[in-house]
Protein backbone atom coordinates (compact mmCIF):
# COMPACT_ATOMS: atom_id res chain seq x y z
CA UNK A 1 0.00 0.00 0.00
CA UNK A 2 1.52 3.32 -1.05
CA UNK A 3 1.75 6.07 1.53
CA UNK A 4 -0.29 9.14 0.64
CA UNK A 5 1.15 12.53 1.45
CA UNK A 6 -1.00 14.76 3.67
CA UNK A 7 -0.89 18.42 2.71
CA UNK A 8 -2.38 21.70 3.86
CA UNK A 9 -5.52 22.64 1.89
CA UNK A 10 -4.66 26.32 2.32
CA UNK A 11 -1.56 26.04 0.18
CA UNK A 12 -2.00 27.62 -3.25
CA UNK A 13 -0.23 24.70 -4.89
CA UNK A 14 -2.65 22.21 -3.32
CA UNK A 15 -5.64 24.23 -4.51
CA UNK A 16 -4.25 24.21 -8.05
CA UNK A 17 -3.63 20.47 -7.83
CA UNK A 18 -7.21 19.86 -6.67
CA UNK A 19 -8.55 21.88 -9.60
CA UNK A 20 -6.51 19.79 -12.03
CA UNK A 21 -7.99 16.60 -10.57
CA UNK A 22 -11.49 18.07 -10.79
CA UNK A 23 -11.07 18.27 -14.56
CA UNK A 24 -11.13 14.45 -14.62
CA UNK A 25 -13.46 13.70 -11.71
CA UNK A 26 -15.94 15.58 -9.56
CA UNK A 27 -13.81 15.84 -6.41
CA UNK A 28 -14.48 17.73 -3.19
CA UNK A 29 -12.39 17.57 -0.01
CA UNK A 30 -13.70 17.75 3.55
CA UNK A 31 -12.18 17.50 7.01
CA UNK A 32 -15.18 15.60 8.36
CA UNK A 33 -15.28 11.84 8.11
CA UNK A 34 -18.24 10.34 6.25
CA UNK A 35 -19.17 6.70 5.91
CA UNK A 36 -21.84 4.55 4.33
CA UNK A 37 -21.65 5.72 0.73
CA UNK A 38 -19.89 4.02 -2.16
CA UNK A 39 -19.00 7.38 -3.71
CA UNK A 40 -17.04 8.60 -0.66
CA UNK A 41 -13.32 7.89 -0.44
CA UNK A 42 -11.76 8.13 3.01
CA UNK A 43 -8.11 9.15 3.24
CA UNK A 44 -6.68 8.38 6.66
CA UNK A 45 -3.26 9.59 7.78
CA UNK A 46 -1.42 10.38 10.99
CA UNK A 47 -2.18 14.06 10.34
CA UNK A 48 -5.95 13.65 10.34
CA UNK A 49 -8.86 12.33 8.31
CA UNK A 50 -9.74 13.51 4.84
CA UNK A 51 -12.70 12.54 2.70
CA UNK A 52 -12.52 12.89 -1.07
CA UNK A 53 -15.86 12.54 -2.80
CA UNK A 54 -15.42 10.95 -6.23
CA UNK A 55 -18.66 11.09 -8.17
CA UNK A 56 -17.69 8.00 -10.15
CA UNK A 57 -21.10 7.16 -11.54
CA UNK A 58 -21.83 10.69 -12.77
CA UNK A 59 -18.44 10.76 -14.51
CA UNK A 60 -19.09 7.43 -16.21
CA UNK A 61 -22.59 8.46 -17.29
CA UNK A 62 -21.24 11.62 -18.88
CA UNK A 63 -18.20 9.94 -20.46
CA UNK A 64 -19.76 6.67 -21.65
CA UNK A 65 -23.26 6.40 -23.07
CA UNK A 66 -23.53 2.73 -22.08
CA UNK A 67 -23.85 3.77 -18.42
CA UNK A 68 -26.63 6.33 -18.94
CA UNK A 69 -29.31 3.96 -17.62
CA UNK A 70 -27.39 2.66 -14.60
CA UNK A 71 -28.71 3.26 -11.09
CA UNK A 72 -26.61 4.55 -8.22
CA UNK A 73 -26.78 1.12 -6.57
CA UNK A 74 -24.68 -0.50 -9.31
CA UNK A 75 -21.36 -1.69 -7.90
CA UNK A 76 -18.03 -0.38 -9.16
CA UNK A 77 -17.03 -3.93 -10.04
CA UNK A 78 -20.04 -4.18 -12.34
CA UNK A 79 -19.10 -0.92 -14.04
CA UNK A 80 -15.49 -2.01 -14.37
CA UNK A 81 -16.38 -4.77 -16.83
CA UNK A 82 -16.88 -2.16 -19.56
CA UNK A 83 -14.52 0.71 -18.71
CA UNK A 84 -11.86 -0.30 -16.22
CA UNK A 85 -8.81 -2.35 -17.23
CA UNK A 86 -8.96 -5.63 -15.34
CA UNK A 87 -5.82 -7.36 -14.06
CA UNK A 88 -6.55 -9.92 -11.31
CA UNK A 89 -8.25 -7.78 -8.65
CA UNK A 90 -6.80 -4.46 -9.80
CA UNK A 91 -8.68 -1.90 -11.87
CA UNK A 92 -7.13 1.13 -13.59
CA UNK A 93 -8.80 4.30 -14.79
CA UNK A 94 -7.20 4.89 -18.23
CA UNK A 95 -8.20 8.57 -18.39
CA UNK A 96 -5.64 9.56 -15.73
CA UNK A 97 -2.02 10.06 -16.73
CA UNK A 98 -1.00 8.95 -13.23
CA UNK A 99 -3.39 6.05 -13.00
CA UNK A 100 -5.43 5.30 -9.91
CA UNK A 101 -5.69 1.57 -9.23
CA UNK A 102 -8.15 -0.18 -6.95
CA UNK A 103 -7.76 -3.37 -4.94
CA UNK A 104 -10.87 -5.17 -3.71
CA UNK A 105 -10.90 -7.26 -0.53
CA UNK A 106 -13.51 -8.55 1.91
CA UNK A 107 -11.06 -8.45 4.81
CA UNK A 108 -12.36 -5.28 6.44
CA UNK A 109 -9.81 -5.41 9.26
CA UNK A 110 -7.24 -4.06 6.79
CA UNK A 111 -8.99 -0.70 7.06
CA UNK A 112 -7.66 -0.17 10.57
CA UNK A 113 -4.19 -1.72 10.44
CA UNK A 114 -2.36 0.94 8.44
CA UNK A 115 -1.89 4.59 9.31
CA UNK A 116 -1.86 5.56 5.61
CA UNK A 117 -4.49 4.00 3.37
CA UNK A 118 -7.22 4.99 0.97
CA UNK A 119 -10.43 3.02 0.60
CA UNK A 120 -14.16 3.12 0.10
CA UNK A 121 -16.85 0.54 0.74
CA UNK A 122 -18.91 -1.25 -1.88
CA UNK A 123 -21.37 -4.11 -1.95
CA UNK A 124 -18.41 -6.45 -2.44
CA UNK A 125 -16.29 -5.22 0.45
CA UNK A 126 -13.61 -2.59 0.94
CA UNK A 127 -11.93 -1.14 -2.15
CA UNK A 128 -8.43 0.23 -1.54
CA UNK A 129 -6.40 2.64 -3.63
CA UNK A 130 -3.08 0.92 -4.33
CA UNK A 131 -1.78 3.98 -6.16
CA UNK A 132 -2.89 7.59 -6.38
CA UNK A 133 -1.43 10.73 -8.00
CA UNK A 134 0.56 12.62 -5.37
CA UNK A 135 1.75 16.20 -5.21
CA UNK A 136 5.40 16.56 -6.21
CA UNK A 137 7.72 19.25 -4.90
CA UNK A 138 9.92 19.09 -8.00
CA UNK A 139 9.37 17.76 -11.51
CA UNK A 140 12.09 16.77 -13.98
CA UNK A 141 10.89 17.79 -17.44
CA UNK A 142 12.92 14.99 -19.03
CA UNK A 143 10.86 12.50 -17.01
CA UNK A 144 7.49 13.75 -18.25
CA UNK A 145 5.72 11.27 -20.51
CA UNK A 146 5.03 12.13 -24.15
CA UNK A 147 2.78 10.23 -26.54
CA UNK A 148 4.79 8.58 -29.33
CA UNK A 149 2.86 7.29 -32.35
CA UNK A 150 4.37 4.87 -34.86
CA UNK A 151 2.31 5.94 -37.88
CA UNK A 152 2.18 3.61 -40.91
CA UNK A 153 0.10 5.74 -43.27
CA UNK A 154 -2.98 7.85 -43.88
CA UNK A 155 -5.89 8.40 -46.24
CA UNK A 156 -8.19 11.28 -47.15
CA UNK A 157 -11.78 10.09 -47.01
CA UNK A 158 -15.09 11.90 -47.47
CA UNK A 159 -17.15 12.26 -44.31
CA UNK A 160 -20.11 10.62 -46.03
CA UNK A 161 -17.97 7.57 -46.83
CA UNK A 162 -16.89 7.20 -43.21
CA UNK A 163 -20.52 7.23 -42.10
CA UNK A 164 -21.23 4.20 -44.32
CA UNK A 165 -18.31 2.09 -43.06
CA UNK A 166 -19.15 -1.08 -41.14
CA UNK A 167 -17.19 -3.80 -39.38
CA UNK A 168 -15.45 -5.99 -41.96
CA UNK A 169 -15.01 -3.18 -44.51
CA UNK A 170 -11.52 -2.21 -45.69
CA UNK A 171 -10.13 1.33 -45.84
CA UNK A 172 -7.38 1.64 -48.46
CA UNK A 173 -4.15 3.14 -47.14
CA UNK A 174 -3.49 5.90 -49.70
CA UNK A 175 -0.14 7.05 -48.32
CA UNK A 176 2.30 4.59 -46.78
CA UNK A 177 5.05 5.95 -44.56
CA UNK A 178 6.85 5.06 -41.35
CA UNK A 179 6.77 8.37 -39.49
CA UNK A 180 7.35 8.81 -35.76
CA UNK A 181 5.13 11.43 -34.11
CA UNK A 182 5.62 12.91 -30.66
CA UNK A 183 2.58 14.76 -29.32
CA UNK A 184 1.24 14.74 -32.93
CA UNK A 185 4.41 16.41 -34.29
CA UNK A 186 6.69 14.54 -36.73
CA UNK A 187 10.08 14.02 -35.12
CA UNK A 188 11.56 11.27 -37.31
CA UNK A 189 10.91 7.83 -38.72
CA UNK A 190 11.45 4.17 -37.89
CA UNK A 191 12.62 1.02 -39.67
CA UNK A 192 11.26 -2.42 -38.73
CA UNK A 193 13.53 -5.46 -39.14
CA UNK A 194 12.62 -9.13 -39.63
CA UNK A 195 12.47 -9.65 -35.86
CA UNK A 196 9.66 -7.08 -35.50
CA UNK A 197 12.05 -4.59 -33.90
CA UNK A 198 11.99 -0.89 -34.78
CA UNK A 199 15.06 1.32 -35.16
CA UNK A 200 14.13 4.92 -34.33
CA UNK A 201 15.73 7.75 -36.31
CA UNK A 202 15.21 11.39 -35.37
CA UNK A 203 15.18 14.01 -38.13
CA UNK A 204 16.88 17.39 -37.85
CA UNK A 205 13.88 19.18 -39.36
CA UNK A 206 10.25 18.34 -39.95
CA UNK A 207 10.34 19.42 -43.60
CA UNK A 208 7.50 20.98 -45.56
CA UNK A 209 3.90 20.38 -44.63
CA UNK A 210 1.83 18.37 -47.09
CA UNK A 211 -1.28 20.44 -46.37
CA UNK A 212 -2.24 23.20 -48.79
CA UNK A 213 -5.04 25.72 -48.68
CA UNK A 214 -7.84 24.80 -51.10
CA UNK A 215 -10.83 26.98 -51.97
CA UNK A 216 -13.96 24.83 -51.79
CA UNK A 217 -17.61 25.62 -52.38
CA UNK A 218 -19.56 23.57 -49.81
CA UNK A 219 -22.91 22.27 -50.99
CA UNK A 220 -23.03 19.47 -48.41
CA UNK A 221 -21.19 19.17 -45.15
CA UNK A 222 -20.63 15.47 -45.87
CA UNK A 223 -18.43 16.48 -48.82
CA UNK A 224 -15.78 17.72 -46.40
CA UNK A 225 -12.61 15.63 -46.57
CA UNK A 226 -11.19 14.37 -43.29
CA UNK A 227 -7.79 12.82 -42.67
CA UNK A 228 -7.74 9.21 -41.52
CA UNK A 229 -4.50 8.11 -39.82
CA UNK A 230 -3.52 4.50 -39.22
CA UNK A 231 -1.42 4.17 -36.08
CA UNK A 232 0.60 0.99 -35.69
CA UNK A 233 1.43 1.65 -32.03
CA UNK A 234 1.11 4.33 -29.37
CA UNK A 235 3.59 4.51 -26.52
CA UNK A 236 4.07 6.93 -23.64
CA UNK A 237 7.80 7.55 -23.33
CA UNK A 238 10.08 9.95 -21.48
CA UNK A 239 12.84 11.92 -23.20
CA UNK A 240 15.41 9.75 -21.47
CA UNK A 241 13.76 6.59 -22.81
CA UNK A 242 13.57 8.07 -26.31
CA UNK A 243 17.28 8.92 -26.17
CA UNK A 244 18.02 5.31 -25.22
CA UNK A 245 16.20 3.95 -28.27
CA UNK A 246 17.72 6.51 -30.63
CA UNK A 247 21.28 5.79 -29.50
CA UNK A 248 21.55 2.02 -29.25
CA UNK A 249 18.33 0.21 -28.39
CA UNK A 250 15.72 -1.42 -30.64
CA UNK A 251 12.03 -0.98 -29.86
CA UNK A 252 10.28 -4.36 -29.81
CA UNK A 253 6.85 -4.50 -31.44
CA UNK A 254 4.27 -7.11 -30.36
CA UNK A 255 4.15 -10.12 -32.69
CA UNK A 256 0.52 -9.47 -33.67
CA UNK A 257 0.86 -5.70 -33.99
CA UNK A 258 -0.62 -5.60 -37.52
CA UNK A 259 -3.90 -6.95 -36.10
CA UNK A 260 -4.35 -4.00 -33.75
CA UNK A 261 -4.03 -0.83 -35.86
CA UNK A 262 -5.67 2.26 -34.35
CA UNK A 263 -7.76 4.32 -36.76
CA UNK A 264 -7.96 8.06 -36.07
CA UNK A 265 -10.06 10.67 -37.85
CA UNK A 266 -8.65 14.19 -37.47
CA UNK A 267 -6.77 12.94 -34.42
CA UNK A 268 -9.73 11.24 -32.71
CA UNK A 269 -9.83 7.46 -32.27
CA UNK A 270 -12.78 5.98 -34.17
CA UNK A 271 -11.92 2.31 -34.54
CA UNK A 272 -9.46 -0.53 -34.83
CA UNK A 273 -8.46 -2.84 -37.65
CA UNK A 274 -5.94 -5.20 -39.18
CA UNK A 275 -3.36 -4.36 -41.84
CA UNK A 276 -4.15 -6.49 -44.91
CA UNK A 277 -2.69 -6.84 -48.37
CA UNK A 278 -4.94 -5.89 -51.27
CA UNK A 279 -4.38 -5.55 -55.00
CA UNK A 280 -1.73 -2.89 -55.67
CA UNK A 281 -1.35 -1.88 -52.05
CA UNK A 282 -2.53 -2.26 -48.48
CA UNK A 283 -5.68 -1.62 -46.51
CA UNK A 284 -7.07 -1.74 -43.00
CA UNK A 285 -9.84 -4.28 -42.41
CA UNK A 286 -12.17 -2.84 -39.78
CA UNK A 287 -12.57 -4.97 -36.64
CA UNK A 288 -14.33 -2.36 -34.47
CA UNK A 289 -15.97 0.92 -35.46
CA UNK A 290 -17.24 3.65 -33.12
CA UNK A 291 -18.70 6.15 -35.59
CA UNK A 292 -22.36 7.01 -35.02
CA UNK A 293 -24.67 6.77 -37.99
From Swiss-Prot:
InterPro entries: FliN-like_C, SpoA-like_sf, T3SS_OMP_SpaO. SUPFAM superfamilies: Surface presentation of antigens (SPOA) (SSF101801). Changing residue 13 to I: In plasmid pCP301. Gene3D superfamilies: SpoA-like (2.30.330.10). Keywords: Plasmid, Virulence. GO terms for biological process: protein secretion. Pfam families: FliMN_C. Belongs to the FliN/MopA/SpaO family. Required for surface presentation of invasion plasmid antigens. Could play a role in preserving the translocation competence of the Ipa antigens. Required for invasion and for secretion of the three Ipa proteins. This is Surface presentation of antigens protein SpaO. It comes from Shigella flexneri.
Amino acid sequence: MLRIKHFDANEKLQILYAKQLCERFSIQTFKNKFTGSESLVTLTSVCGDWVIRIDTLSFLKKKYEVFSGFSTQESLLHLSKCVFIESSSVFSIPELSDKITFRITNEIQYATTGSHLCCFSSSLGIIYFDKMPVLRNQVSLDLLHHLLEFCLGSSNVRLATLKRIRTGDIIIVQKLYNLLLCNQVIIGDYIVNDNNEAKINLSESNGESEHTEVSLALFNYDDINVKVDFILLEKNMTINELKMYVENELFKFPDDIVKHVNIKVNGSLVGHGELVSIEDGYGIEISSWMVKE
